[in-house]
Amino acid sequence: MENGNGKMEFCMKDPLNWGMAAESMKGSHLDEVKKMVAEFRKPVVQLAGKTLTIAQVAAIAARDDGVTVELAEAAREGVKASSDWVMESMNKGTDSYGVTTGFGATSHRRTKQGGALQKELIRFLNAGIFGNGTETSHTLPHSATRAAMLVRINTLLQGYSGIRFEILEAITKFLNTNITPCLPLRGTITASGDLVPLSYIAGLLTGRPNSKAVGPTGEKLNAEEAFRLAGISSGFFELQPKEGLALVNGTAVGSGMASMVLYEANILGVMSEVLSAVFAEVMNGKPEFTDHLTHKLKHHPGQIEAAAIMEHILDGSGYVKAAELLHEMDPLQKPKQDRYALRTSPQWLGPQIEVIRSATKMIEREINSVNDNPLIDVSRNKALHGGNFQGTPIGVAMDNTRLAIAAIGKLLFAQFSELVNDYYNNGLPSNLTGSRDPSLDYGFKGAEIAMASYCSELQFLANPVTNHVQSAEQHNQDVNSLGLISSRKTSEAVEILKLMSSSFLVALCQAVDLRHIEENVRLAVKKTVSQVAKKTLNIGVDGVLHPSRFSEKELLRVVDREYVFAYADDPCSATYPLMQKLREVLVSHALANSGNEKDASTSIFHKIGVFEEELKGILPKEVENARASVENGTPAIPNKIEECRSYPLYKFVRGELGTELLTGEKVRSPGEELDQVFNALCEGKLVDPLLACLEAWNGAPLPIC
């Protein structure tokens, strides 16, 4: 913190920063995500060195022309003071690392040519490989480069690095005009900082002939063209002593990419909670798994919040009410509990949310840190030689985040597998097939195979990076963080989790529509069975009330019990359970009516054939009419999802994106629908409908009563 004179004053009430770390974790994760989204959408990022957020980094990275960077003018004095100190120190003959000495393991060398030393630093660090770009790109994505530029400016603004303010202004102009230096994808161990990639930013600033940049429309630029388009009229910079080191000796590339990754990971964490609740809805799950007492007794805040969010989605849901009625029928013949992928989803997701949230705070501390060497302490008139360039917080945070992402993906895969499996999904068709003829529709079978592939790759990526450290630079950099490598692997993991989340969301929407068809077809079948029963079973041939009339209620209970999609493609087939169970009811009544069975006028056995023939003449047509009414938008029963808190997600996928029920009768493939949802997720279009599902949540679980 700063005192009234603008000098840094470190808080002695919390000298170890644990209090600040704990304070930053107050409040719900959802509120934090909402705050991130709001920050991401702001048009200006104001840099002062100490208040940068991962959302702001993600915004600069992703929104090429929608956001502007502004530097705090108040920082100019401190930046200038450290720059002046370096020049004065060198003029006095003070020996300082990287100013009068060589670098790393060769720091025993000495020189008085400070400017030439910085020039050589940039030259020898330009050791990256880009390739010809025809097959595989070895260039860091320009979004990650923009993130690195922003984070490096933020560090250097704090006035401990010995660099001119004008250089920071030049990098800012590159950002604001969408001029992006080309950095190599690989070649850094993030200790001593991200030396190799950051040297290419310095190379552009100094006009090195090998430096390249990309313009606003993707055009390739040399240094001269980049300066002209950015409006930097001062010409290429001749680096002063320490300035090259200030530019390259930092963790900005690793922490910049980590910020981008964590912005998405936090949103995907919330999405996994909502998708798990929708999964419970379409699976006819029992909602008691979200009861607050269960989770309060476990104590973990991530679990408690995950359960409370799911509880909020399920509270008042029409699916939950229907499921309660379903579970009341024949309760002893059904599992008492749902499977783990549903029932323990809060316990599974909670720790992952905690890990992602903790990693977010760790990276936010890193992007607001001073992480080069040496540090210039003007107030004490000294250069401090330390190791803040060691990016261990990045490597550790990213390894942990990747584990959490893999765990979330594993849960989504388990849920997806249950959803498409008719042994487990409580009446939905196998593979979620939507056609009238399931023998010519295999629904989401291909998507399930793809999900297995995604999940396998994601589990492999969960392996840690930070235990693969190699001693580098003549054993001077004998331990190093591998921060950027871990960030890159976590970025890959996030992409795969987005593939899985998109696939699962489309499958859930398919399940919602199938439940809607199921409900309308069941109603049509009940009406038809009731109508046929009254016509054929109530009155005997002599006009007298027939004993079989008492079977109607049991016949309707059969319709309630039987899974619609077990017979819907051929409702009167003798090999399907509906007709078999209806016949069983009539046979049992006939057996109980044994005394009257010899008389044709009172025999129930004689009525069975009449009932079945009448049903065969009407039922297939009524089932088709019910299905057609759903497809035409005129169903007898509206879609339950419209009254549910999860509706905004469904509405977006079906309404905004224009997707529809997938069937083998149509040409459209699952991949076409999945692509639409995936692209929308990547573009951030799913954020608003996702948060709309939780708009009414007050941040607390339902009371225990």
UniProtKB/Swiss-Prot annotation:
InterPro entries: Aromatic_Lyase, Fumarase/histidase_N, L-Aspartase-like, Phe/His_NH3-lyase_AS, Phe_NH3-lyase, Phe_NH3-lyase_shielding_dom_sf. Keywords: Cytoplasm, Lyase, Phenylalanine catabolism, Phenylpropanoid metabolism. There is a cross-link at residues 191-193 (5-imidazolinone (Ala-Gly)). (E)-cinnamate binds at residues 249, 337, 343, 373, 445, 473, 476. Pathway: Phenylpropanoid metabolism; trans-cinnamate biosynthesis; trans-cinnamate from L-phenylalanine: step 1/1. SUPFAM superfamilies: L-aspartase-like. The keyword rRNA-binding does not apply. One of its GO terms (molecular function) is phenylalanine ammonia-lyase activity. GO terms for cellular component: cytoplasm. GO terms for biological process: cinnamic acid biosynthetic process; L-phenylalanine catabolic process. Expressed mainly in roots. Its main location: cytoplasm. It holds the Pfam family Lyase_aromatic. The active site is at residue 97. It catalyses: L-phenylalanine = (E)-cinnamate + NH4(+). Contains an active site 4-methylidene-imidazol-5-one (MIO), which is formed autocatalytically by cyclization and dehydration of residues Ala-Ser-Gly. Gene3D superfamilies: Fumarase/aspartase (Central domain), Fumarase/aspartase (N-terminal domain), Phenylalanine ammonia-lyase 1, domain 3. It is found in: Cytoplasm. The modification 2,3-didehydroalanine (Ser) is found at residue 192. Its EC number is 4.3.1.24. This is a key enzyme of plant metabolism catalyzing the first reaction in the biosynthesis from L-phenylalanine of a wide variety of natural products based on the phenylpropane skeleton. Homotetramer. Belongs to the PAL/histidase family. This is Phenylalanine ammonia-lyase 2. It comes from Lithospermum erythrorhizon (Purple gromwell). The lineage of its organism: Eukaryota, Viridiplantae, Streptophyta, Embryophyta, Tracheophyta.
